[in-house]
Amino acid sequence: DIQMIVGGNVKRLEDVKKYIYTGAKKAILDMSKDTNVEIVKEASERFGSDKIAVMLNKDYDFSKIKQLKYDGVSLIIADSCANECIGLGIKILAFNCNFTFNDMVEFGKQDKVYGISDNSFAGDFDFLNFKAQLKEEGVNTIVFESAMSFDQFKKNSDGMIPVVVQDYKTDKVLMVAYMNEEAFNLTIKTGKMTYFSRSRNEIWVKGVTSGYFQY
């Protein structure tokens, strides 16, 4: 159920239709191509502005950028030009802007920011920890949070809470384990089920050994 924003090889309105009708959240039109520029308004009127995104690069004529809002564009994917797109009332996705962490914090606090896409996020990048850092810096981002703090749970004699782990689709009970406060907080922060082993007297993450992580 991951929502996709899809673009590439758009030459006519029918290509936009194919992307949207196959389930894309938005179709991307490339503003460096005249054929895409010509169909922005018509695509927005036909499929809805919420379905249309455009990609700009630093060579774009920014004197024309305000027209995009009137043409019904709901998202700008700004290739190396995110800061030039701030303040237009259109959501912005920064793309390949070579931001430092401080740049990301500053950009993330701007109005209408949709997100940041960068090559540094590739591989085994720890997104959850990164988002937690952004949250601490005051950037509005979605992180895992618990409706209850650890001290609100009823604990056993060891000061731990028993955890019954179930498959979220079938409700099948997979295992029973225990969490101390550290394991509980790590579970919320990382999104990976983390427990306390009473026999080994240590924290452990389900899946580190077997590869079968629980989320």
Question: Where are the regions a protein language model picked out?
Answer:
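Catalytic cores of alpha/beta
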Residues: M4-V6, K11-G23, D61-D71, A82-I116
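C-terminal helical cap(s) of enzyme catalytic domains, especially alpha/beta-barrels
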Residues: V37-F47, M104-V143
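Binding-site signature for planar aromatic cofactors or substrates
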Residues: K135-Y215
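Short beta->alpha connector loops at strand-helix junctions that form conserved
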Residues: G8, L29-S32, N119
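Conserved anion-binding
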Residues: K17-S80
